[in-house]
């Protein structure tokens, strides 16, 4: 016989279970204010000190745990530098294991970038001096240690680079760091009851059920009314995001990995693969608070239906709540920004070689072969090649020390107005790219290319690249 009391008890228990499963930060009346990474702005050869440290930090409110980071902080400071300057880096490894560091997107030689050929042992230091020759862009630095990059990056070895040039400084774009030019480093994680990061090393992917930005869940930021610039880095190990605003208002994409688009692209959502970066402009001249979210907008009932959802689904899909304050800017109705870029002109470069790479997301093989450090892909300096990338599942791809233009996605050509220099892309079927090699690498200090899913990369879904 149906028992109403038992049925009500089950409903109450279900609700209690759902609410207890939520992190406390999501149940609080107010969100945490967004943590802005410290800014290290270097001029005229001022050195940049980066110590790799074990630090204490509360990923979950009230639960301080050991994580990794730089200069005593979880995650790293944002390094800001201008084209034409030199970056005098000073790394020191205070961690108990060796680490290989690299700067994804930075255009420099293999010897100066570091990478897999430069293992920084415990207590060891390394001080490369890197000339900055590229156009304005957003890059990021993280661990690339062979077979250990996912774990080390997941623990907190990640940070942002901002490169400015004359065009970006005179563009009129929002540029006040942490005020209307906001750095956002996205990670998904799993935590145990003590708030410690959970990591399973023998998997080909890691999908956390909790979304962090700059080391916080679902934070807010107060911003002045007007246009706000978001610099996004997907530092997740495997997850790609489809980002949108919860009120479906338009956004403007102005830059990708390696720099500006020819003109701003108006869109309502954008996909961000692991390692990929994007710069968005949001119009906050009018209206109230708005949330940047990953995936579709959710209602309150999702708290309960999520009990039966995929265990990899994010508990809260809020990236950031933007809270505008003050009066609207008198310059609020600015024209659609346009930028000078040589990207489109390079579509007609002479192609010296064509290659095909197929990535197996189940086995980690590239072109049906496991990783072998003796197997090297050789390219000639100052040439352009056409690469066709395919995979048997959705996978992020990235290349170090070089840059590329996307010619087509699944045999559909990319509009010239959307052409921009890149170093990371999502493969969901087939992608055809033009790769330009402007910097040297060697057998001792090679570049890497392959899976941007660091779990899969640690399984060997990568290749070494020597440019001479």
From Swiss-Prot:
Where is the signal peptide, in residue numbers? 1-33
Q: Where does the UniProt annotation locate this protein?
A: Periplasm
Keywords carried by this UniProt record: Cell cycle, Cell division, Periplasm, Signal
Q: Which InterPro entries match?
A: Cu-oxidase-like_N (IPR011707), Cu-oxidase_fam (IPR045087), Cupredoxin (IPR008972), FtsP (IPR026589), TAT_signal (IPR006311)
**Modified after translation how?**
Predicted to be exported by the Tat system. The position of the signal peptide cleavage has not been experimentally proven.
Gene Ontology terms: cellular component = cell division site; outer membrane-bounded periplasmic space
Superkingdom, taxonomy of origin = Bacteria
Please state the protein's primary subcellular location. periplasm
- Answer whether the UniProt record assigns the keyword Flavoprotein to this protein: no
- Gene Ontology biological process: FtsZ-dependent cytokinesis
Which terms in the Gene Ontology molecular function aspect does this entry carry?
Answer: copper ion binding
Record's family? Answer: Belongs to the FtsP family.
Describe its function: Cell division protein that is required for growth during stress conditions. May be involved in protecting or stabilizing the divisomal assembly under conditions of stress.
Q: What's the protein here called?
A: Cell division protein FtsP
Lineage of producing organism = Bacteria, Pseudomonadati, Pseudomonadota, Gammaproteobacteria, Pasteurellales
